[in-house]
């Protein structure tokens, strides 16, 4: 009798104990993220890779376009450019015994003569008597004759009947550039000393200065 009671009590205690269930096992291939998250991630990676490749391709294209004009220059073109750059200074060179200043070549005579003879000498050299453009050029030519203590002829004479000082190229003297000192009459020509511009007889003897234009298309030739 006592043994049966004990058995019943033990049986009830075991049946009253709650049953523990083990958690369901997860498959290794099962992901806790929704499927559209994975799809968005893959698309984002693909777009990033395409963007990087596009930037690289664009950079290569720009470099190619920049280098193309340089590669198109043939050896003949390069040689021609070198020849032009080498020849340009030679075309601007004045003849021997001539001095260059700005866009002109200047030659100071070593002898004295009348204005007409001086004009003819310059003409024989393919030049003209000096035509003074401005005060700066006047200072330059005075420095050329410094120490000679003599006046020099320029291409300026007094003409009739208009009673004007005119340059040999036909232009009228600008008094802002030169101011003539001395008596002005028929047969007067202009000479320049270290401190003034003189009116004197064209038959007087003076040294003279010839000039040639410096032009890129032609070289001053020795006379």
Curated annotation (Swiss-Prot):
<dbReference type="Pfam" id="PF00059">
    <property type="entry name" value="Lectin_C"/>
</dbReference>
<keyword id="KW-0735">Signal-anchor</keyword>
<dbReference type="GO" id="GO:0042803">
    <property type="term" value="F:protein homodimerization activity"/>
</dbReference>
<comment type="subunit">
    <text>Homodimer; disulfide-linked. Interacts with tyrosine kinase LCK. Binds PTPN6/SHP-1 in a phosphorylation-dependent manner.</text>
</comment>
<feature type="domain" description="C-type lectin">
    <location>
        <begin position="101"/>
        <end position="211"/>
    </location>
</feature>
<feature type="disulfide bond">
    <location>
        <begin position="189"/>
        <end position="202"/>
    </location>
</feature>
<dbReference type="InterPro" id="IPR033992">
    <property type="entry name" value="NKR-like_CTLD"/>
</dbReference>
<feature type="topological domain" description="Extracellular">
    <location>
        <begin position="67"/>
        <end position="223"/>
    </location>
</feature>
<dbReference type="InterPro" id="IPR051527">
    <property type="entry name" value="KLR_subfamily_B"/>
</dbReference>
<protein>
    <recommendedName>
        <fullName>Killer cell lectin-like receptor subfamily B member 1B allele C</fullName>
    </recommendedName>
</protein>
<feature type="topological domain" description="Cytoplasmic">
    <location>
        <begin position="1"/>
        <end position="45"/>
    </location>
</feature>
<feature type="short sequence motif" description="ITIM motif">
    <location>
        <begin position="5"/>
        <end position="10"/>
    </location>
</feature>
<keyword id="KW-1133">Transmembrane helix</keyword>
<keyword id="KW-0812">Transmembrane</keyword>
<dbReference type="InterPro" id="IPR001304">
    <property type="entry name" value="C-type_lectin-like"/>
</dbReference>
<dbReference type="GO" id="GO:0042269">
    <property type="term" value="P:regulation of natural killer cell mediated cytotoxicity"/>
</dbReference>
<dbReference type="GO" id="GO:0030246">
    <property type="term" value="F:carbohydrate binding"/>
</dbReference>
<feature type="disulfide bond">
    <location>
        <begin position="122"/>
        <end position="210"/>
    </location>
</feature>
<dbReference type="InterPro" id="IPR016186">
    <property type="entry name" value="C-type_lectin-like/link_sf"/>
</dbReference>
<dbReference type="GO" id="GO:0030101">
    <property type="term" value="P:natural killer cell activation"/>
</dbReference>
<comment type="function">
    <text>Receptor for CLEC2D/OCIL. Ligand-binding contributes to inhibition of cytotoxic natural killer (NK) cells. May mediate MHC class I-independent 'missing-self' recognition of allografts, tumor cells and virus-infected cells.</text>
</comment>
<dbReference type="GO" id="GO:0042802">
    <property type="term" value="F:identical protein binding"/>
</dbReference>
<dbReference type="GO" id="GO:0009986">
    <property type="term" value="C:cell surface"/>
</dbReference>
<dbReference type="GO" id="GO:0005886">
    <property type="term" value="C:plasma membrane"/>
</dbReference>
<keyword id="KW-1015">Disulfide bond</keyword>
<feature type="transmembrane region" description="Helical; Signal-anchor for type II membrane protein">
    <location>
        <begin position="46"/>
        <end position="66"/>
    </location>
</feature>
<keyword id="KW-0675">Receptor</keyword>
<dbReference type="InterPro" id="IPR016187">
    <property type="entry name" value="CTDL_fold"/>
</dbReference>
<keyword id="KW-0430">Lectin</keyword>
<dbReference type="GO" id="GO:0045954">
    <property type="term" value="P:positive regulation of natural killer cell mediated cytotoxicity"/>
</dbReference>
<dbReference type="GO" id="GO:0038023">
    <property type="term" value="F:signaling receptor activity"/>
</dbReference>
<keyword id="KW-0472">Membrane</keyword>
<feature type="short sequence motif" description="LCK-binding motif">
    <location>
        <begin position="31"/>
        <end position="34"/>
    </location>
</feature>
<dbReference type="GO" id="GO:0009897">
    <property type="term" value="C:external side of plasma membrane"/>
</dbReference>
């Amino acid at each position: 009798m006592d043994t049966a009671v004990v058995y019943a009590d033990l049986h009830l205690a075991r049946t009253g104990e709650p049953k523990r269930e083990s958690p369901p096992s997860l498959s290794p291939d099962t992901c806790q993220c929704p499927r559209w998250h994975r799809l968005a991630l893959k698309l984002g990676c693909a777009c990033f890779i395409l963007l990087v490749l596009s930037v690289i391709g664009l950079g290569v294209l720009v470099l190619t376009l920049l280098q193309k004009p340089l590669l198109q220059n043939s050896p003949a073109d390069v040689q021609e450019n070198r020849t032009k750059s080498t020849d340009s200074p030679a075309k601007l060179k004045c003849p021997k015994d001539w001095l260059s200043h700005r866009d002109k070549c200047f030659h100071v005579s070593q002898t004295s003569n009348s204005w007409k003879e001086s004009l003819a000498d310059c003409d024989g050299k393919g030049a003209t008597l000096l035509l003074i453009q401005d005060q700066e050029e006047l200072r330059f030519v005075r420095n050329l004759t410094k120490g000679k203590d003599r006046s020099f002829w320029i291409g300026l004479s007094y003409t009739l009947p208009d009673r004007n000082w005119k340059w040999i190229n036909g232009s009228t003297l600008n008094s802002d550039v030169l101011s003539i000192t001395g008596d002005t009459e028929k047969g007067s020509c202009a000479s320049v000393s270290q401190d003034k511009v003189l009116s004197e007889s064209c038959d007087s003897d003076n040294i003279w200065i010839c000039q040639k234009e410096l032009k890129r298309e032609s070289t001053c030739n020795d006379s």
